[in-house]
């Protein structure tokens, strides 16, 4: 088992030998002995630079990898930026956040408010119940609740501390017609401009690209704050490093101490709202119907709990969700199925953490091409990531993981987004059906080949093409959807 030494650039370098075991038990026993009794210094050939455990596949051969330090650091930043708590559907919450921040600058309640909203903002606020509002719905309600009782320092949990008095005041101001909504003809899908008036004083606040990305604040024509952040500019991490290969390497090797606290919050928050959706009365009760109507099995429970969590969130449940890429539904769809699958199959917590890191980053990677809001349903991207993460969870090879992705995107790449609403839960269930079928096909060595429709030679190329269709090709589709919804 001693390592071979070779000379690289005049220096002795250690290169690993693959270790072959006669059984999985032998492998498990040896690895645990080495981990417990040795240090990185004593066995540098066994441990990767950042690895808790060697990455290994299921044929008994250990593959020792050295993770790029930059990838490690940047991917941790990406996860920290995108996996954040939010209470309620993120678009009305963005309006509430804008209202709360603008009111801070104004210094008092306004007597007139104008909310200019892009088409995608209108589409995604129109039908969802605002949390902690006692069933209020709509753009005006989101803005006024933020203005009256929002706490901007809590970002996407801005409405957490609303009181009965806040709700009464907001409702009275809504009845008086204090807030009006104007369509903002913008090429930026997520674009908000708020004007708050009080006597002769005016505060204007603008948000672009991301739900809390304030780009400009003025008071009485004086610029208080200005940022030139373009799309993606609000990210401090380098997203160009994202690829299926790099995501898998990161998930294999990242020290669990670097990710477990963040992913514990994902598990706790997203499973809590899934349980609430199953127990409570939200929407059509789709989770319970799925669980009771289909033959019992892990795939059915995955769909049921993920759909239930989405329906509760869309129905105004005030429990927080750990969102992904600005979306609670994507946060739920990329995590709950993986958690349910791991628990049902008694897969260890450490492996679950790695699968969740993989699923989360794969969702983010897909959304980098599509954008935060578009005519393309985000449930497809997140469910695709869950299916691929389950392939990863079961020790699937990189090829099998990529085939899972391709099998999903060969099937349901054209699902439209017609706004946030309770039927998003049904789209999650349907997308998970496709994701599990893709997983089963891949694990049985079956995959749709390149040139099958839009599929490309590599999964990353396919993801890029689907993103291009969602972001550019479906622009007119998005406009027609919004036009129909506003009729």
Q: Residue spans of the language-model regions?
A:
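Signature of multi-pass transmembrane helix bundles
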Residues: 175-316, 481-487
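Mobile "lid/hinge" segments at catalytic clefts and subdomain interfaces of large enzymes
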Residues: 137-139, 144-157, 161-166, 170-173, ...
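Conserved phosphate/anionic-ligand binding catalytic regions in large, soluble enzymes, centered on
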Residues: 85-101, 319-335, 378-381
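Hydrophobic alpha-helical bundle architecture
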Residues: 102-105, 131, 341-354, 364-430, ...
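Acidic-glycine-rich active-site phosphate/pyrophosphate-binding loop
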Residues: 67-76, 109-122, 297-316, 349-366, ...
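Early transmembrane hairpin of solute transport permeases
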Residues: 93-192, 196
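A structural signal for small-residue-enriched, beta-sheet-centric alpha/beta enzyme cores
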Residues: 87-90, 120-124, 128-131, 209-212, ...
């Amino acid at each position: 088992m001693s390592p071979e030494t070779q000379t690289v650039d005049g220096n002795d370098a250690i290169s690993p030998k693959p270790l072959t075991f006669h059984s999985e038990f032998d492998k498990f026993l040896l690895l645990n002995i080495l981990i417990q009794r040795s240090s990185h210094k004593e066995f540098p050939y066994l441990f990767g630079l950042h690895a808790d455990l060697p990455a290994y596949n299921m044929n008994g051969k250990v593959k020792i990898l050295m993770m790029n330090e930059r990838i490690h650091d940047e991917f941790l930043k990406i996860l920290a930026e995108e996996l954040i708590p939010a209470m309620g559907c993120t678009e009305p919450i963005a309006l509430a956040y804008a209202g709360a921040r603008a009111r801070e600058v104004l210094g008092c309640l306004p007597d007139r408010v104008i909310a200019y909203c892009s088409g995608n903002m209108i589409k995604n606020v129109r039908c969802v119940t605002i949390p902690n509002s006692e069933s209020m719905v709509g753009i005006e309600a989101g803005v006024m609740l933020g203005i009256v009782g929002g706490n901007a320092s809590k970002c996407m949990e801005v409405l957490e501390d609303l009181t009965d008095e806040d709700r009464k005041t907001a409702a009275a101001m809504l009845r008086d017609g204090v807030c009006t909504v104007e369509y903002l003809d913008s090429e930026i899908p997520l674009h908000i401009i708020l004007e708050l008036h009080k006597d002769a004083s005016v505060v204007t606040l603008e948000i672009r690209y991301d739900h809390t990305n304030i780009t400009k604040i003025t008071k009485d024509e004086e610029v208080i704050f200005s940022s030139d952040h373009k799309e993606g500019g609000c990210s401090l991490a380098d997203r160009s490093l994202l690829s299926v290969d790099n995501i898998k390497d990161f998930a294999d090797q990242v020290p669990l101490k670097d990710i477990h606290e963040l992913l514990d919050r994902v598990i706790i928050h997203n499973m809590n709202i899934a349980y609430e959706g199953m127990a409570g009365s939200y929407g059509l009760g789709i989770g319970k119907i799925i669980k009771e109507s289909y033959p019992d099995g892990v795939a059915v429970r995955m769909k049921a709990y993920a759909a239930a969590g989405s329906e509760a969130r869309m129905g105004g449940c005030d429990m927080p969700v750990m969102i992904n890429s600005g979306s609670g539904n994507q946060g739920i769809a990329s995590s709950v199925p993986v958690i349910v699958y791991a628990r049902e199959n008694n897969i260890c917590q450490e492996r679950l953490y790695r699968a969740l890191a993989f699923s989360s980053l794969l969702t983010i990677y897909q959304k980098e091409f599509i954008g935060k809001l578009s005519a393309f349903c985000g449930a497809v991207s997140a469910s695709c990531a869950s299916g691929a993460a389950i392939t990863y969870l079961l020790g699937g090879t990189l090829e099998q993981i990529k085939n899972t992705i391709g099998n999903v995107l060969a099937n349901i790449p054209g699902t439209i987004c017609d706004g946030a609403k309770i039927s998003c839960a049904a789209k999650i269930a349907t997308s998970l059906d496709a994701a599990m079928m893709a997983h089963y096909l891949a694990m049985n060595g079956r995959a749709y080949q390149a040139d099958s429709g839009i599929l490309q030679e590599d999964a990353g190329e396919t993801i890029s093409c689907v993103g291009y269709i969602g972001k550019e090709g479906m622009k007119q589709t998005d406009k027609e959807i919004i036009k129909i919804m506003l009729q």
